[in-house]
A protein has these predicted regions:
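A short beta-strand motif characteristic of beta-propeller blades
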Residues: 64, 117-122
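Acidic/hydrophobic-patterned starts of short beta strands in beta-sheet-rich repeat architectures
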Residues: 81-95, 135-145
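Beta-propeller blade signature
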Residues: 106-113
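Signature of short aromatic-glycine-proline-rich micro-motifs recurring in repeat-based ectodomains
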Residues: 66-76
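Acidic, small-residue rich beta-repeat scaffolds with periodic aromatic anchors
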Residues: 19-51, 56-60, 65, 131-181
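Bacterial N-terminal signal peptides that target proteins for export
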Residues: 1-8
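Short consensus segments that form the blades of beta-propeller domains
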Residues: 96-103
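C-terminal motif of bacterial Sec signal peptides marking the signal peptidase cleavage site
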Residues: 15-17
Length: 181
């Protein structure tokens, strides 16, 4: 699994670097500081896991679909509009990853803060979340990335993402962002 992750990350970095000017660490620091998301509290993480029917143990680990104890990851995803910054909760594969998820990162759950709690607005298993530059109802469109030449496309319907056809690899554009990174 580690080799597949390294290979995928290397390919993504190589593709992302094509045709872009190199930046120095000094260039990157102000961007990181300005765009750094607020740290999530332990209570927020627990609330997100409970929103997807998972109960963390004392160390924060959960049981994935393969019955492996794993540590979830939490990533801020900017979607704009009424959603704003959502949270992507990744329940990764463990020792059984290839039999459950193939080369994918695991179970992905996209959550939106609704007051003091969180609600799931999209989920997928074994693929990647692709955030597109296009938007509907003021919120960025998303696609389920993975093998193949076209992928399920989702538009914001005001409360969650609903499937709206497919999108070809070539139509995603260079500005599409893939998660987890």
């Amino acid at each position: 699994m580690r080799f597949a992750q390294i290979l995928m990350a290397s390919a993504c970095l190589a593709l992302a670097a094509c045709g872009q000017a190199a930046t120095t660490p000094a260039d990157a620091q102000p961007q990181a500081a300005a765009g750094a998301p607020a740290a999530l509290s332990a209570a927020d993480k627990t609330a997100m896991l409970r929103a997807i029917n998972m109960t963390p143990d004392a160390s924060g680990r959960v049981t994935n679909a393969c019955s492996d104890k794993v540590t979830p990851t939490f990533t801020a995803v900017e979607l704009g509009g009424a959603v704003g910054t959502a949270q992507l909760v990744v329940i990764p594969g463990g020792p059984s990853s290839y039999t459950c998820y193939g080369d994918g990162p695991g179970d992905l759950h996209l959550l939106r803060r609704t007051g003091a709690s969180f609600s799931e607005i999209h989920a997928l298993q074994g693929g990647f979340l692709v955030v597109l530059a296009t938007s509907h109802n003021g919120v960025k469109d998303i696609a389920d990335g993975g093998p193949g030449m076209s992928h399920p496309l989702y538009w914001w319907n005001g409360s969650a993402y609903a499937q709206h056809g497919e999108i070809a690899d070539s139509a995603m554009g260079d500005s599409a962002q893939m998660y987890p990174q």
